[in-house]
């Protein structure tokens, strides 16, 4: 088993990471300053570093030995400034949390691509003319870390829509508002379903192709990729390969300590 090296280092990468949220040593700090710092370069300091969470700390391991920030995962293919990383933040477990969303909102006054009205607000028709309006418009994202997914009732649904009572005045049978937290693009080789509801799983299609379809649809739906901007098979392959090489797991528990010591096999390398 590979052991995580715990050491202080100075590295550069084009990513927003927490300064004191990542820690090294025998125990996590008493508290975390989540203020992001901007770093630049090709490879990031994520590999082998431990980021605090509610029960201790977790770490990311890529089978390539580093997380490549030049990968298509970190590039924008749409029209609204988003990348995959917008909703899949490494320091927050490759997803978003209310704390991370609030941090981004406060730093950008709610103008970050994360808060685009196509799915970052409670309704696509909501008012975003002022910071107060933007805060109200993205309340589900700010308070619960949830992205709005608009889907029609599927033909095979085992239910019928009897009535609509939407406080945000948008949902209908043609566009249900489903609020969900983005799933981490890590530990994917262990999965047999893509998406919360499995809608990217198609009969006779491999998991690789399911993931490629998900990446393609994400750039269309969440990043608002234009119809004429076709993604090549090489780009989709790059994203899927990147994701399937990522593994994430708890490395430190507040009660048990380091999970790879005293015979323990904790951590993403396991």
How would you name each of these model-derived features?
Residues 1-2, 174:
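Short intrinsically disordered, low-complexity coil segments enriched in acidic
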Residues 2-13:
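Bacterial N-terminal signal peptides that target proteins for export
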Residues 3, 16-18, 115:
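Compositionally biased amphipathic helical and low-complexity segments enriched in hydrophobic
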Residues 11-22:
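Bacterial N-terminal signal peptides
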Residues 22-28:
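Membrane-interface motif at the C-terminal end of an N-terminal transmembrane signal
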Residues 28-270:
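Periplasmic c-type cytochrome electron-transfer domains
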């Amino acid at each position: 088993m590979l052991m995580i090296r715990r050491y202080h280092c100075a590295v550069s990468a084009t990513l927003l990471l927490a300064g004191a949220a990542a820690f090294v040593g025998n125990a996590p700090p008493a508290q975390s300053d989540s203020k992001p710092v901007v770093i630049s370069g090709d490879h990031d300091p994520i590999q082998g570093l431990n980021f605090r969470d509610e029960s201790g700390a977790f770490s990311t391991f890529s089978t390539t030995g580093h997380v490549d920030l030049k990968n298509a995962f970190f590039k924008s293919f749409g029209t609204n400034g988003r990348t995959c990383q917008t909703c899949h933040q490494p320091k927050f477990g490759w997803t978003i949390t209310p704390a991370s969303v609030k941090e981004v909102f406060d730093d950008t006054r709610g103008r970050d691509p994360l808060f685009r009205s196509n799915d970052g607000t409670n309704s696509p028709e909501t008012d975003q003319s002022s910071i107060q309006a933007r805060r109200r418009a993205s309340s589900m994202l700010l308070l619960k870390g949830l992205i709005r997914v608009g889907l029609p009732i599927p033909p095979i649904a085992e239910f019928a829509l009897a009535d609509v009572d939407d406080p945000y005045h948008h949902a209908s049978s043609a566009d249900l508002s489903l609020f969900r937290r983005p799933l981490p693009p890590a530990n994917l080789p262990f999965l047999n379903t893509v998406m919360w509801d499995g809608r990217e799983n198609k009969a006779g299609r491999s998991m690789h192709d399911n993931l490629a379809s998900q990446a393609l649809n994400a750039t269309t739906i969440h990043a608002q990729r234009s119809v004429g901007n076709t993604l090549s098979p090489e780009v989709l392959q790059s994203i899927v390969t990147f994701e399937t090489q990522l593994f994430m797991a708890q490395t430190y528990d507040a009660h048990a300590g380091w999970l790879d010591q005293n015979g323990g096999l904790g951590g993403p390398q396991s």
